[in-house]
């Protein structure tokens, strides 16, 4: 029963996170401006695509993504909540309170995400190469955009990668 729930979560979370990126204008949420740039959108899509292909590969090869322990599920859900808080809190220089909240959630999500990448890299040798590729894509993304201003957008991309790669039995 729990495997089925985790399979569904592993499939739905990335899709639910991808929907706002497609259908809503970033201007409505008052983004920092990174994702409003057309080149950044194309680069973001390039970074998201390998994660989506990896998800498709796992499901077609009947190797579903599932979470081994309840702690891992809680950890991922906590990271998801932090990322969503970053995603939906506006960053506006004229409103320092909301800007600080946005940066607070963004920085916490960033450090938790890095710890999760490290944990998966050392604990799961099966996904080690995939982690390296996704980290490289994230590095290319942030260095090409030459800015950490769009931290929430960057976390949005990396959280999709993280939610696709979980521990296996």
Q: How would you label these PLM feature ranges?
A:
Residues 28-30, 60-64, 87-96, 140-148:
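Juxtamembrane "helix-exit" motif on the non-cytosolic side of transmembrane helices
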Residues 4-12, 65-79, 124-134:
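Membrane-interfacial loop-to-transmembrane alpha-helix junctions, especially the N-terminal start
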Residues 33-42, 91-106, 144-154:
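Membrane-helix interface and helix-disruption motif detector
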Residues 16-22, 79-88, 136-146:
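Aromatic-anchored segments of alpha-helical transmembrane domains
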Residues 75-132:
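Membrane-proximal helix-loop-helix units in multi-pass membrane proteins
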Residues 124-169:
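Terminal transmembrane helical module of multi-pass membrane proteins
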Residues 1-67:
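N-terminal topogenic module of multi-pass integral membrane proteins
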Residues 11-17, 44-58, 108-120, 156-169:
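Hydrophobic cores of alpha-helical transmembrane segments in multi-pass inner/ER membrane proteins
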């Amino acid at each position: 029963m729990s495997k089925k729930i985790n399979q569904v979560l592993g499939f739905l979370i990335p899709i639910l996170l991808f929907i706002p990126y497609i259908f809503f204008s970033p201007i409505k949420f008052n983004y920092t401006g990174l994702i409003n740039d057309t080149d950044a959108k194309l680069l973001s899509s390039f970074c998201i695509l390998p994660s989506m292909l990896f998800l498709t590969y796992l499901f077609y090869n009947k190797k579903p993504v599932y979470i081994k322990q309840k702690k891992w599920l809680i950890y991922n859900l906590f990271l998801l909540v932090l990322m969503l808080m970053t995603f939906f809190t506006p960053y506006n220089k004229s409103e320092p309170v909301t800007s600080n909240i946005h940066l607070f959630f963004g920085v916490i999500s960033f450090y938790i995400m890095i710890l999760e990448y490290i944990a998966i890299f050392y604990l799961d040798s099966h996904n080690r190469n995939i982690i390296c590729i996704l980290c490289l894509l994230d590095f290319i993304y942030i260095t090409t955009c030459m800015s950490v201003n769009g931290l929430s957008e960057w976390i949005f991309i990396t959280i999709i990668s993280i939610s696709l790669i979980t521990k296996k039995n």
